[in-house]
Amino acid sequence: MGKFEVLDHPLIQHKLTMIRDKRVGTKVFRETVKEISTLMAYEVSRNMPLKDVEVETPIAKTTQKELAGKKVAIIPILRAGLGMVDGMTELIPAAKIGFIGMYRDEETLKPHEYFVKLPNDITERQLFIVDPMLATGGSAVMAIEALKKRGCQEKNMKFACLVAAPEGVKAVQEAFPDVDIYTAGLDERLNEDGYIVPGLGDAGDRLFGTK
Protein backbone atom coordinates (compact mmCIF):
# COMPACT_ATOMS: atom_id res chain seq x y z
CA MET A 1 0.00 0.00 0.00
CA GLY A 2 1.35 3.42 -0.94
CA LYS A 3 1.84 6.03 1.76
CA PHE A 4 -0.26 9.13 2.32
CA GLU A 5 1.52 11.98 4.06
CA VAL A 6 0.55 15.50 5.05
CA LEU A 7 3.79 17.48 5.13
CA ASP A 8 3.63 19.42 8.38
CA HIS A 9 6.96 21.26 8.12
CA PRO A 10 6.43 24.71 9.69
CA LEU A 11 7.63 26.59 6.59
CA ILE A 12 5.29 24.60 4.35
CA GLN A 13 2.35 25.27 6.64
CA HIS A 14 3.17 28.99 6.95
CA LYS A 15 3.47 29.46 3.19
CA LEU A 16 0.32 27.44 2.52
CA THR A 17 -1.59 29.80 4.82
CA MET A 18 -0.23 32.73 2.81
CA ILE A 19 -1.59 31.47 -0.52
CA ARG A 20 -4.99 30.58 0.94
CA ASP A 21 -5.60 34.30 1.51
CA LYS A 22 -7.77 35.64 -1.32
CA ARG A 23 -6.04 39.02 -1.09
CA VAL A 24 -2.72 37.59 -2.31
CA GLY A 25 -2.02 38.62 -5.89
CA THR A 26 -0.63 36.62 -8.80
CA LYS A 27 3.05 37.50 -8.24
CA VAL A 28 3.17 36.51 -4.58
CA PHE A 29 0.94 33.48 -5.16
CA ARG A 30 3.20 32.20 -7.95
CA GLU A 31 6.41 32.80 -5.99
CA THR A 32 5.04 31.13 -2.88
CA VAL A 33 3.79 28.08 -4.78
CA LYS A 34 7.32 27.71 -6.12
CA GLU A 35 8.76 27.95 -2.60
CA ILE A 36 6.33 25.36 -1.23
CA SER A 37 7.12 23.05 -4.14
CA THR A 38 10.85 23.25 -3.38
CA LEU A 39 10.20 22.34 0.24
CA MET A 40 7.91 19.50 -0.85
CA ALA A 41 10.58 18.17 -3.24
CA TYR A 42 12.86 17.75 -0.23
CA GLU A 43 10.23 15.63 1.53
CA VAL A 44 9.02 13.67 -1.51
CA SER A 45 12.60 12.66 -2.37
CA ARG A 46 13.47 11.69 1.20
CA ASN A 47 13.59 7.93 0.55
CA MET A 48 15.52 7.99 -2.71
CA PRO A 49 18.19 5.24 -2.63
CA LEU A 50 21.87 5.95 -2.05
CA LYS A 51 25.07 4.09 -2.87
CA ASP A 52 28.64 4.25 -1.59
CA VAL A 53 31.22 6.08 -3.71
CA GLU A 54 34.91 6.77 -3.27
CA VAL A 55 35.80 10.47 -3.13
CA GLU A 56 39.15 12.15 -2.68
CA THR A 57 38.93 15.43 -0.78
CA PRO A 58 41.86 17.87 -0.56
CA ILE A 59 42.75 16.06 2.67
CA ALA A 60 42.09 12.33 2.21
CA LYS A 61 40.21 9.58 0.38
CA THR A 62 36.81 8.73 1.84
CA THR A 63 33.68 6.68 1.21
CA GLN A 64 30.54 8.82 0.92
CA LYS A 65 26.99 8.60 -0.43
CA GLU A 66 25.42 9.62 -3.73
CA LEU A 67 22.03 9.06 -5.33
CA ALA A 68 21.44 5.66 -6.87
CA GLY A 69 18.54 3.99 -8.61
CA LYS A 70 16.19 5.62 -11.06
CA LYS A 71 16.55 9.18 -12.34
CA VAL A 72 13.61 11.52 -11.83
CA ALA A 73 10.97 12.86 -14.19
CA ILE A 74 8.55 15.55 -13.04
CA ILE A 75 5.10 15.33 -14.62
CA PRO A 76 2.88 18.40 -14.16
CA ILE A 77 -0.81 18.05 -14.90
CA LEU A 78 -1.57 21.07 -17.08
CA ARG A 79 -2.09 23.78 -16.59
CA ALA A 80 -1.88 24.41 -12.85
CA GLY A 81 0.81 21.77 -12.34
CA LEU A 82 3.24 24.02 -14.21
CA GLY A 83 3.34 26.24 -11.14
CA MET A 84 5.09 23.49 -9.16
CA VAL A 85 7.75 22.54 -11.71
CA ASP A 86 10.31 25.30 -11.09
CA GLY A 87 10.22 24.67 -7.36
CA MET A 88 10.83 20.96 -7.82
CA THR A 89 13.71 21.51 -10.26
CA GLU A 90 15.41 23.87 -7.79
CA LEU A 91 16.37 20.71 -5.88
CA ILE A 92 16.38 18.23 -8.78
CA PRO A 93 17.80 20.26 -11.69
CA ALA A 94 18.63 17.23 -13.84
CA ALA A 95 15.04 15.94 -13.80
CA LYS A 96 13.33 15.55 -17.15
CA ILE A 97 9.89 17.10 -17.54
CA GLY A 98 6.82 15.44 -19.05
CA PHE A 99 3.39 16.98 -19.57
CA ILE A 100 -0.16 15.67 -19.24
CA GLY A 101 -2.89 18.12 -20.25
CA MET A 102 -6.32 17.88 -18.63
CA TYR A 103 -9.38 20.09 -18.51
CA ARG A 104 -12.44 19.64 -16.31
CA ASP A 105 -15.97 19.63 -17.67
CA GLU A 106 -17.64 22.19 -15.41
CA GLU A 107 -21.00 20.40 -15.62
CA THR A 108 -19.95 16.79 -15.02
CA LEU A 109 -16.71 17.63 -13.14
CA LYS A 110 -15.07 14.85 -15.19
CA PRO A 111 -11.54 15.36 -16.54
CA HIS A 112 -10.66 15.13 -20.23
CA GLU A 113 -7.15 14.43 -21.50
CA TYR A 114 -6.01 16.62 -24.39
CA PHE A 115 -2.20 16.39 -24.41
CA VAL A 116 0.54 13.95 -23.37
CA LYS A 117 4.25 14.55 -23.98
CA LEU A 118 6.73 12.43 -22.04
CA PRO A 119 10.48 11.72 -22.04
CA ASN A 120 11.48 8.75 -24.20
CA ASP A 121 12.89 6.90 -21.18
CA ILE A 122 9.86 7.56 -18.98
CA THR A 123 9.51 3.90 -17.94
CA GLU A 124 13.02 3.95 -16.48
CA ARG A 125 12.42 6.94 -14.21
CA GLN A 126 11.00 7.74 -10.79
CA LEU A 127 7.96 9.92 -11.49
CA PHE A 128 6.86 12.92 -9.44
CA ILE A 129 3.36 13.83 -10.66
CA VAL A 130 2.42 17.35 -9.56
CA ASP A 131 -0.86 19.26 -9.44
CA PRO A 132 -1.70 21.94 -6.85
CA MET A 133 -5.17 20.54 -6.14
CA LEU A 134 -6.37 17.00 -5.49
CA ALA A 135 -10.14 17.57 -5.49
CA THR A 136 -12.31 14.78 -6.92
CA GLY A 137 -9.18 12.85 -7.87
CA GLY A 138 -10.37 12.48 -11.46
CA SER A 139 -7.42 14.26 -13.09
CA ALA A 140 -4.87 12.45 -10.94
CA VAL A 141 -6.43 9.07 -11.71
CA MET A 142 -6.52 9.82 -15.43
CA ALA A 143 -2.90 11.02 -15.41
CA ILE A 144 -1.73 7.88 -13.65
CA GLU A 145 -3.72 5.77 -16.11
CA ALA A 146 -2.04 7.60 -19.00
CA LEU A 147 1.37 6.80 -17.54
CA LYS A 148 0.50 3.17 -16.92
CA LYS A 149 -0.69 2.80 -20.52
CA ARG A 150 2.80 3.85 -21.55
CA GLY A 151 4.48 1.20 -19.43
CA CYS A 152 5.10 3.04 -16.16
CA GLN A 153 4.60 1.22 -12.86
CA GLU A 154 2.69 2.47 -9.84
CA LYS A 155 5.60 1.73 -7.53
CA ASN A 156 7.67 4.31 -9.42
CA MET A 157 5.08 7.09 -9.05
CA LYS A 158 4.62 9.74 -6.38
CA PHE A 159 1.82 12.32 -6.49
CA ALA A 160 2.37 15.72 -4.86
CA CYS A 161 -0.21 18.47 -4.35
CA LEU A 162 -0.61 21.60 -2.27
CA VAL A 163 -4.14 20.91 -1.02
CA ALA A 164 -6.19 17.70 -1.05
CA ALA A 165 -9.79 16.79 -0.28
CA PRO A 166 -10.53 13.45 1.41
CA GLU A 167 -12.61 12.45 -1.63
CA GLY A 168 -9.65 12.87 -3.96
CA VAL A 169 -7.24 11.00 -1.72
CA LYS A 170 -9.69 8.11 -1.49
CA ALA A 171 -10.20 8.01 -5.26
CA VAL A 172 -6.47 7.76 -5.98
CA GLN A 173 -5.81 5.24 -3.23
CA GLU A 174 -8.64 2.98 -4.39
CA ALA A 175 -7.60 3.14 -8.04
CA PHE A 176 -3.84 2.94 -7.50
CA PRO A 177 -2.97 1.66 -4.03
CA ASP A 178 0.79 1.61 -4.68
CA VAL A 179 1.10 5.31 -5.55
CA ASP A 180 2.44 7.51 -2.74
CA ILE A 181 0.52 10.76 -2.12
CA TYR A 182 2.02 13.88 -0.52
CA THR A 183 0.11 17.04 0.29
CA ALA A 184 0.80 20.26 2.16
CA GLY A 185 -2.79 20.38 3.43
CA LEU A 186 -5.69 17.95 3.86
CA ASP A 187 -8.89 19.99 3.81
CA GLU A 188 -12.45 19.27 4.94
CA ARG A 189 -14.43 18.33 1.84
CA LEU A 190 -15.61 19.24 -1.65
CA ASN A 191 -18.51 21.63 -2.20
CA GLU A 192 -21.31 21.07 -4.73
CA ASP A 193 -19.17 22.63 -7.48
CA GLY A 194 -16.29 20.25 -6.86
CA TYR A 195 -14.04 22.85 -5.19
CA ILE A 196 -12.01 22.04 -2.10
CA VAL A 197 -13.28 23.63 1.13
CA PRO A 198 -11.69 25.78 2.49
CA GLY A 199 -9.12 25.31 -0.28
CA LEU A 200 -7.37 28.21 -1.99
CA GLY A 201 -9.63 28.85 -4.98
CA ASP A 202 -8.74 27.95 -8.57
CA ALA A 203 -4.98 27.40 -8.47
CA GLY A 204 -4.57 27.80 -12.24
CA ASP A 205 -6.40 31.12 -12.32
CA ARG A 206 -4.44 32.44 -9.35
CA LEU A 207 -1.11 31.30 -10.81
CA PHE A 208 -1.66 32.80 -14.24
CA GLY A 209 -3.97 35.72 -13.52
CA THR A 210 -6.90 34.36 -15.52
CA LYS A 211 -10.59 33.90 -14.80
UniProtKB/Swiss-Prot annotation:
<dbReference type="InterPro" id="IPR034332">
    <property type="entry name" value="Upp_B"/>
</dbReference>
<dbReference type="GO" id="GO:0004845">
    <property type="term" value="F:uracil phosphoribosyltransferase activity"/>
</dbReference>
<keyword id="KW-0328">Glycosyltransferase</keyword>
<dbReference type="Pfam" id="PF14681">
    <property type="entry name" value="UPRTase"/>
</dbReference>
<comment type="pathway">
    <text>Pyrimidine metabolism; UMP biosynthesis via salvage pathway; UMP from uracil: step 1/1.</text>
</comment>
<dbReference type="GO" id="GO:0000287">
    <property type="term" value="F:magnesium ion binding"/>
</dbReference>
<feature type="binding site">
    <location>
        <begin position="131"/>
        <end position="139"/>
    </location>
    <ligand>
        <name>5-phospho-alpha-D-ribose 1-diphosphate</name>
    </ligand>
</feature>
<comment type="function">
    <text>Catalyzes the conversion of uracil and 5-phospho-alpha-D-ribose 1-diphosphate (PRPP) to UMP and diphosphate.</text>
</comment>
<feature type="binding site">
    <location>
        <position position="79"/>
    </location>
    <ligand>
        <name>5-phospho-alpha-D-ribose 1-diphosphate</name>
    </ligand>
</feature>
<dbReference type="InterPro" id="IPR029057">
    <property type="entry name" value="PRTase-like"/>
</dbReference>
<dbReference type="InterPro" id="IPR005765">
    <property type="entry name" value="Ura_phspho_trans"/>
</dbReference>
<keyword id="KW-0547">Nucleotide-binding</keyword>
<keyword id="KW-0460">Magnesium</keyword>
<keyword id="KW-0808">Transferase</keyword>
<feature type="binding site">
    <location>
        <position position="196"/>
    </location>
    <ligand>
        <name>uracil</name>
    </ligand>
</feature>
<keyword id="KW-0021">Allosteric enzyme</keyword>
<feature type="binding site">
    <location>
        <begin position="201"/>
        <end position="203"/>
    </location>
    <ligand>
        <name>uracil</name>
    </ligand>
</feature>
<comment type="similarity">
    <text>Belongs to the UPRTase family.</text>
</comment>
<dbReference type="GO" id="GO:0044206">
    <property type="term" value="P:UMP salvage"/>
</dbReference>
<dbReference type="InterPro" id="IPR050054">
    <property type="entry name" value="UPRTase/APRTase"/>
</dbReference>
<protein>
    <recommendedName>
        <fullName>Uracil phosphoribosyltransferase</fullName>
        <ecNumber>2.4.2.9</ecNumber>
    </recommendedName>
</protein>
<keyword id="KW-0342">GTP-binding</keyword>
<feature type="binding site">
    <location>
        <position position="104"/>
    </location>
    <ligand>
        <name>5-phospho-alpha-D-ribose 1-diphosphate</name>
    </ligand>
</feature>
<dbReference type="InterPro" id="IPR000836">
    <property type="entry name" value="PRibTrfase_dom"/>
</dbReference>
<feature type="binding site">
    <location>
        <position position="202"/>
    </location>
    <ligand>
        <name>5-phospho-alpha-D-ribose 1-diphosphate</name>
    </ligand>
</feature>
<dbReference type="GO" id="GO:0005525">
    <property type="term" value="F:GTP binding"/>
</dbReference>
<dbReference type="GO" id="GO:0006223">
    <property type="term" value="P:uracil salvage"/>
</dbReference>
